[in-house]
């Protein structure tokens, strides 16, 4: 506790953080405030309460008593992904129970509706689902908790989650251009995140120079999301209709261009697919999957040099991209660059022990 300050930070950690460790530890400890760090090491999304404290109601009482003891006047709740959801859930409830305190929330990619298709809460939670707290849209809206939701515009679920709350007055949406889901990590490599959070504390604004216009358009998020789901259901024709409409709304969105390219490829429209993948790369040079599909299509067309370049660019963007490493290894084997082929296959085996395709390449070359 910092008894000289009436400001309190409550930081909720994201997934896969071991017991005793906390996210934002260094940044929040630089703040002139009292600090509370919370972690759910079993990826429970905080819907069963704070581990070691009890269910959500008991956890709220626990935080209520601490804030009273600290004589808090201002509270900032902060968290990425699972932690962003926790910050919004507990912030909304605490604000209604403690109206004399100013509560604010800074969420980095938190979900507003858990367990829907493509939601990380459905894929990564290691605890039973709790439908009672699955959809917090009405809760955060009625609580009037001031929320800033910062999210990457290179993530379909994050874009759709923002779509779900677009227009709610107390939620300020900020999309970050070409950022993946781990938007706080992405921003931490590009800006002074401590300074940005301190400015938010002082002025109530979280300013990002790399903000995109994706957060401004509600319909785009639904079109992209449902176009993606239709592709998963092998309904490429309907997916293309939605994705083409999404592109008319935001033509310069790399992820939408990439997804349209994939849908076109499903219908074997290779030339059109390649065009949209190249548009995606022009908009986001680090979009690994777009590089992979350009490489794959180029190899199909016999352009080995272009294929090699884009496989390597894919791996530069995502060094653990197994499909790109395997494809590049096969390409090198085809052109008799055996040492390079082995190098790629050994990298695959380092990331994916026992990978059959990599083992087969190694056996063929070293027999």
Predicted regions and their residues:
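The feature captures the conserved acid-bearing segment of alpha/beta-hydrolase catalytic domains
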Residues: 118-188, 192-195, 200-204
């Amino acid at each position: 506790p910092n008894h000289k300050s009436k400001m309190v930070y409550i930081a909720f950690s994201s997934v896969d953080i071991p017991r005793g460790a906390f996210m934002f530890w260094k940044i929040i400890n630089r703040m002139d405030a009292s600090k509370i760090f919370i972690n759910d090491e079993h990826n429970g999304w905080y819907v069963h309460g704070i581990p070691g404290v009890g269910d959500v109601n008991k956890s709220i009482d626990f935080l209520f008593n601490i804030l009273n003891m600290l004589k808090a006047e201002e509270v900032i709740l902060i968290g990425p992904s699972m932690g962003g959801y926790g910050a919004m859930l507990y912030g909304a409830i605490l604000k209604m129970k403690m109206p004399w305190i100013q509560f604010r929330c800074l969420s980095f990619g938190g979900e507003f509706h858990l367990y829907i298709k493509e939601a990380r809460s459905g894929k990564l939670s290691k605890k039973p689902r709790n439908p009672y707290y699955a959809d917090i849209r009405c809760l955060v809206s009625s609580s009037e908790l001031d929320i800033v939701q910062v999210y990457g515009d290179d993530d379909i679920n994050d874009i759709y989650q923002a779509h779900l709350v677009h227009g709610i007055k107390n939620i300020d949406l900020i999309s970050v251009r070409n950022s993946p889901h781990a938007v706080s990590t992405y921003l931490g490599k590009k800006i002074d995140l401590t300074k940005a959070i301190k400015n938010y504390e002082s002025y109530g604004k979280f300013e990002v120079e790399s903000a995109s216009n994706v957060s401004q358009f509600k319909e785009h998020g639904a079109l992209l999301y449902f176009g993606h789901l239709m592709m998963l259901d092998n309904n490429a024709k309907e997916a293309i209709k939605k994705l083409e409409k999404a592109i008319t709304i935001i033509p310069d969105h790399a992820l939408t261009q990439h997804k349209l390219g994939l849908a076109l490829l499903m219908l074997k429209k290779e030339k059109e697919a390649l065009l949209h993948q190249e548009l995606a790369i022009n908009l986001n040079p680090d979009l690994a999957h777009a590089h992979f599909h350009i490489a794959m299509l180029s190899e199909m067309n016999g352009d080995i040099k272009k294929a090699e370049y884009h496989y390597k660019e894919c791996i530069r963007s995502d060094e653990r991209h197994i499909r790109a490493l395997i494809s590049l290894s096969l390409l090198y084997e085809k052109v008799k660059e055996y040492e390079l082929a082995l190098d790629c296959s050994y990298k695959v085996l380092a990331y994916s022990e026992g990978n059959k395709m990599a083992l087969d390449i190694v056996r063929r070359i070293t027999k």
